[in-house]
Amino acid sequence: MSGSTYLQKALVLLCLSVFCWAGCAKKEKESTPVQAVSTPGQTGITRHAISKEHPRLLGSRQELQDLAEQRPEAYARVVGVARNIEAGDQLIADRHGKMISMALVCAIDGDNELCKQAVQMAMKYIEAPVRVGHETFGHDLANCALVYDLCYPCWTEEERLKFHDYMNRTVDANVNSETHVFHNAWYGYKHWGYGLACYATWYENERAPEILETTRQDYITRAAPALELAGDGGGWAEGYYINYWSYEWMFFCEVARRCEGFDCYELAPRFYTNRAVASMFEAYPGIRENNSRRPIPMGDSGGQKFRPERDKALSARRILVNFFRDDPAHQVVHAFNETTPVSGVPGNAYKDFLWRDTTVNKGDLKAFKLSHFSPGAGYVYARSSWDEDATYFYFKCGDRFTAHQHLDNGHFLICKYEELAGDGGQYYYFGGEHDVNYLLRTIAHSSILVYDPDETWTNIRAWKGAIGNDGGQMHDWPHHNGAAVDVADWEKNRQLYDIADMLAFEDRGEYLYVAGDCSRAYSPKKLEYFTRQIVFIRPGTFVIFDRVKSKDPNFRKTWQLQAAKPPTGKAPELVITNGRGRLFVQTVLPEKALVKLNQGSDLYTYGGKSYAPEEERGPAPECRVGVSPSSPSAVDYFLHVLTATDSACSSVPQAVAQVTDTEVTAALGEAKLVFTKDAVGGEIEISGRRVPLAKQIIAE
């Protein structure tokens, strides 16, 4: 679906929403609900007047008390946080977890002492200067709104008025803050807090309806179309940052649905109906620290160590599972969620209390599909099985939308027990030298470099220093973050942002095939085409065929692999071992390839300069494997076979290539693959069957 189609859909939805909104406003004082609004996940949801009673954001006091009886173990942990744990360390309890826990216990048990303490914590925000710009001012409003609603009787009239004033001043000061709807901050830094504050103060702050309506219209006309475009299939083009904002935004969606029956989900079904499944695929196999799952690295941030966003990802999936509870795929996600039933941060016990609903039917996880495609972001995820020791694969070939994306089309991840091929670099400072010259650049990824000595890069993340020539993909957008404001802006400059195409996707069970065209991600002055075809033969073999044509034969081409650990062995056959996992790397083409292992002090060095990180936030690839042809040519073909195994495995079948004027054939054990040289295509012979490689997207 094109960007213009999304905008047309948004205008229709806006008209319907304004009509329904007007109907609700007229009937606000009535107790009977207005006409039902269609809902994708559940039936019988109606638009209705907002209750005048407090609490209302998460339910009435009686409903919360009933929930405490239904979920006694989780509620006991909430009480423990409220009464015994101090806020501070985000791996124990942050201010948000502490405040909402205290407020819930106040509402459920009538604990006035906790109530007063929670109000005092809220007043520290209210009496402080309003935060403006790229700050989490929406979080501040949300924390205060939850305490306001759950502890309403404990607020004095003066304190309530101060909150209303603080809320209004925050909104007025941030009219021009966080306006980019492809960026996490529109949702997490800003509007979830606006929404909670408006519903909490609906009858007391006369500006609440106006503020909420502005947020609603911005969501309908700009944010929902962005979710449909860049989030089609449930992945999110911004990457890893979805783990930072999706929980807060879906928290608001649930509050809006509960308070007045407004359904945010129906406005972007391509995103919301697929998000929980995509999130499940965006976790490496294996249960790790604090009984959590590690999200895969996508763009900025890599999730190498346990952090609170792992609990956010779990809770966001739970919210969607609860809503789409009758959908078989979401019942499978529920089974997946139940393998990590308790949040990893003690202070997040309230998340288990509110969102973990064990009454949802469990689906058959082991029988579920083994791959998923998110066309909006250009992500393919795949596994060998749903066992915890499965081989994992991720491939990116998608368009540009916003900051936090990397110049990494054609990049892939492989994991077996541990990460074997990952994302290079350390994310610790946005816009710093390491960030601009290494982390976000193609050189930090498993893709292709084409070195034009005259190529230059400018205006990346407002960095004022020198920018190196890594030979990678270009950064040629009007905004220094490479960001489009919204779908209209993206569509207006489509020729700049539409930089890659997923050409084929097919999963036949025994193998998965993907193909992508990454050509437009590079400067047209140096590259004519770069296409990548990958066949994942389960359980652990990857055949990667790349066609690359440069404008000048002397532009050196380099096939890159970001290896988790320095390889052993001797080129063209290398072995990467990380913990219990092992990756065998066979360079089949080009013949007599030049292979360089960039490790140690050379890992972050290119062009005679080092861009080593000043901080380490977690384990990252320790070797950059570079494979180049031994002689210059305009056209080069790269053929690699990567096999992921247990570290106890000592050898794998050797790949043999046969090259003709029109085809490249790779024989690997009982499998044979043929790739055409003049265009993306070919066939696979496996298990006695010869099958053409798909020429299009073939979804399940």
What would you call each of these model-derived segments?
Residues 2-11:
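Bacterial N-terminal signal peptides that target proteins for export
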Residues 54-58, 67-280, 288:
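Aromatic-lined, polymer-binding surfaces characteristic
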Residues 571-624:
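Trp/Gly-enriched beta-strand surface patches
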Residues 37-73:
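Extreme N-terminal leader/anchor segments
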Residues 24-41:
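Bacterial Sec-dependent N-terminal signal peptides
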Residues 10-20:
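Bacterial N-terminal signal peptides
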Residues 244-421, 619, 628-638, 652-700:
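Carbohydrate-active enzyme catalytic cores, enriched for enzymes
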Residues 341-582, 589, 602, 632-640, ...:
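Catalytic and substrate-binding regions of extracellular carbohydrate-active enzymes
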